[in-house]
């Protein structure tokens, strides 16, 4: 199989689809890998590293897309849509429930698109989303602490406080991978942390995990309102695989927050959980202020720590990439149910129910679409 690794072109996206070690594994399995010039430089992998791993370095973006399978990090941007072709396997993060134009382009060009974030194991865990959720969760608490500083628009609060001064209050909505990792860092910074989740069993696990050092609260509209309005930092970390994020924090709740408080919307790439995060921001211009509250809505947070993120992502995605390359997509889907759940579009059909519902499109199961 011929495989392409393009350079990411999203604002300040410094990750790369595969590390040199990942490329080496594919080449050793008999596949041809084309890597776009400087694709890995943002993660401090140079062209020579890929060349030594057995890749062919190409300067033309069109050439790296003229392959059997493209492995990326983030969803293609509009300038990349012309490279789509029938039968192309696209393996990357997609978040299609918030990307109608991209979804339509994938359907029109009959691309076989596999979204990292919807590959799901029998225990409902998301193995290809998990490493980036860990990174984004940990970053969210660090970023929140930074933007609480007065010079960054915040109210000038130190999350850990000092003797005789109260700690900053952090509320985390969602107790999954991102929320759990946000909690770890917020606790490490010395904050007073509350985490809300809809699952009582998960709250029990979090209470055990953190030894009673966090407040675990059932997530419902009244509790969300109560804790949001008294918080200095609110982190949104709710995910429904493949579907748009639920808008759990209303504009009225935001209006009740203190001036200079901060919200971090980790779920912004799926539409966000705050009614007031009405636009996606970038690492170049990461925040805006609305109702006196600092809003951080960067969709590719892990892109700011690309070396760590690329290596973590490569560890998770490489076994699936090898499966697709070695077996071909039909046999890979047939033999691996978790991977088949990652299929979002197949030759003109939407094969993810959450995406179909988001845009009122016709849905076909993977089995129907592939006639397995």
UniProtKB/Swiss-Prot annotation:
NAD(+) binds at residues 169-199. GO terms for molecular function: alanine dehydrogenase activity. It comes from the Bacteria. Its EC number is 1.4.1.1. Keywords: NAD, Oxidoreductase. Pathway: Amino-acid degradation; L-alanine degradation via dehydrogenase pathway; NH(3) and pyruvate from L-alanine: step 1/1. The active site is at 95. Belongs to the AlaDH/PNT family. NCBIfam families: alaDH. This is Alanine dehydrogenase 2. It comes from Staphylococcus aureus (strain bovine RF122 / ET3-1).
């Amino acid at each position: 199989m011929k495989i392409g690794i393009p350079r990411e072109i999203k604002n300040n996206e410094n990750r790369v689809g595969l590390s040199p070690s990942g490329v080496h594994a594919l080449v050793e399995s008999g596949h041809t890998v084309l890597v776009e010039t400087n694709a890995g430089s943002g993660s401090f992998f140079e062209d020579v590293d890929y060349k030594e791993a057995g890749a062919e370095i190409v300067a033309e973006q069109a050439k790296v897309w003229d392959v059997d399978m493209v492995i990326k990090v983030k969803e293609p941007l509009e300038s990349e849509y012309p490279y789509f072709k029938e039968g192309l396997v696209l393996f990357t993060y997609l978040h299609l429930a918030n990307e109608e134009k991209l979804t339509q382009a994938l359907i029109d060009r009959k691309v076989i698109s596999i979204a990292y974030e919807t590959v799901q194991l029998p225990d409902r865990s998301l193995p290809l989303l998990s490493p980036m959720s860990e990174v984004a969760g940990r970053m969210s608490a660090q970023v929140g602490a930074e933007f609480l500083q007065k010079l960054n628009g915040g109210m000038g609060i130190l999350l850990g406080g000092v003797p005789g001064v109260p700690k900053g209050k952090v509320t985390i909505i969602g107790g999954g991978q991102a929320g759990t990792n946000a909690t770890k860092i917020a606790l490490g910074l010395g904050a007073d942390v509350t985490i809300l989740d809809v699952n009582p069993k998960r709250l029990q696990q979090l209470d055990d995990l953190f030894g009673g050092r966090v407040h675990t609260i059932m997530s419902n509209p009244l509790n969300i309102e109560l804790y949001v309005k008294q918080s200095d930092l609110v982190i949104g970390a709710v995910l429904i695989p493949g579907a748009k994020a639920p808008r759990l924090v209303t504009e009225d709740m935001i209006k009740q927050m203190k001036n200079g408080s901060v919200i971090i919307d980790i779920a912004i790439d799926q539409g966000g959980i705050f009614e007031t995060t009405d636009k996606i921001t970038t690492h170049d211009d990461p925040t805006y202020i609305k109702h006196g509250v600092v809003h951080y809505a960067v969709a590719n947070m892990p892109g700011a720590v690309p070396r760590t993120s690329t290596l973590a992502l490569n560890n998770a995605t490489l076994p699936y990439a090898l499966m697709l390359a070695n077996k071909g997509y039909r046999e890979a889907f047939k033999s691996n149910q978790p991977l088949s759940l990652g299929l979002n579009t197949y030759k003109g059909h939407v094969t993810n129910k959450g995406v179909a519902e988001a845009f009122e499109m016709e849905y076909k199961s993977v089995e129907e679409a592939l006639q397995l």
